[in-house]
Regions:
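Active-site-adjacent structural elements that line small-molecule/cofactor binding pockets in enzymes
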Residues: 1-343
Length: 343
């Protein structure tokens, strides 16, 4: 199984764990993944890492659609890929949530399903350079001809010859968007994934493959969820350290009535806990919200504990049908363990 390393986005000060990324490359990790929310962006750090590495793939997990027009996202991904020597960048895309889309980027939430479809179609046209890029979509059209347009825009072809098959992966979780991912993308970054959900998710993917036609299927399609990894004798302590982030995302990373992280928690069978966490978090009772996160919820989406426990629990991930696993860890020994398990 392929391994990825998630380094996420930076906090108040920009910090890149360069030594950790270099170790990942030495250990044979396949990819390193950045992210963005409303601070550091996902693309710029990859350009820096491209100069320091030789082989490891460079993924955005994810670039938010509202942050850039699709042509701009294609330009950024294609430029970094060229800097890295070609064939190394994975353009991971996602919609984020309405609070960030409208509050940070000043864009309408609109119809995310159709925005994803239009966005990917335009990026592919930019990469392929078969003809000047024109697209008539339900959410995005090129050239732009809406309110305020002068009517002088014309289709263009990228000056830079980019990788025409630069892979596009989608970070999705709802049924409609998972089907869309299987239909139009090269890979999937599943939201809220745990191995026991695969029997439910597989038919969604199969329906997307059917819509794509051309014999598309699981062969050649990459599925890479994320899991936190920590070697420790204190399992409960490791799970407790995960809970503040869960409480933040389930409780506050989205509107009360439109929070994808809460929806994912409900889908995994923790509906009562999800509702309670959100109520406490929005009431500014943050410590109580953290305490309301069940141990079981954190445990099944991570690999924590003594080496023997991690080794045993890894089998569920390895056997569930995914092609890769992106890990989050601060421990070199955990990276070494995962590299040995994935061989």
């Amino acid at each position: 199984m392929k391994l990825g390393l998630s380094i996420g986005y930076s906090g108040a000060e920009l910090r890149l764990p360069v030594d950790t990324v270099l170790l990942a490359e030495r250990l044979g990790f396949d990819s390193v993944w950045t992210a963005e929310a409303y601070g550091s962006d996902a693309i710029t750090p990859l350009a820096y890492l491209a100069a320091l590495t030789k082989r490891i793939r460079l993924g955005t997990g994810i670039m938010q659609l509202a942050a850039r027009p699709p042509a701009s996202a294609a330009m950024a991904a294609g430029t970094v890929d060229a800097l890295a020597g070609g064939g190394r960048v994975i353009a991971g895309l996602g919609v984020s949530g309405p609070q960030i889309v409208e509050g940070w980027y000043g864009q309408p939430w609109g119809r995310p399903y159709w925005r994803i479809r239009d966005y990917v179609a335009i990026m592919r046209k930019v990469f392929e350079r078969k003809e000047p890029v024109a697209h008539e979509g339900r959410e995005i059209s090129l050239p732009y001809a809406g309110p305020g347009a002068l009517g002088v825009g014309k289709p263009l072809v990228s000056i830079l010859h980019m990788n025409p098959r630069l892979p596009i992966w989608l970070g999705t979780g709802t049924e409609a968007n998972v089907k869309l991912t299987a239909e139009i993308a090269d890979g999937w970054l599943p939201l809220g994934f745990v191995p026991r959900l695969m029997p439910m998710l597989r038919p969604w993917l199969e329906e997307g493959f059917r819509r794509a036609g051309g014999g598309k299927g699981f062969a050649g399609f990459e599925i890479q969820p994320r899991a936190e990894v920590a070697i420790t004798d204190d399992v409960r302590g490791a799970l407790a350290r995960m809970k503040p982030r869960v409480a933040l995302y389930v409780g506050g990373m989205g509107h009360r009535d439109k929070n994808f992280h809460k929806e994912m928690m409900i889908r995994r069978g923790f509906g009562d806990a999800a509702q309670r966490i959100q109520e406490l978090f929005l009431a500014r009772r943050r410590d109580e919200a953290v305490a309301a996160v069940p141990d079981e919820f954190c445990d099944e989406m991570s690999l924590v504990g003594p080496v023997a426990r991690i080794r045993e629990r890894y089998r569920a991930w390895a056997d569930c049908g995914i092609t890769g696993l992106t890990i989050t860890t601060e421990q070199p020994e955990a990276m070494e363990l995962m590299a040995s398990l994935a061989r």
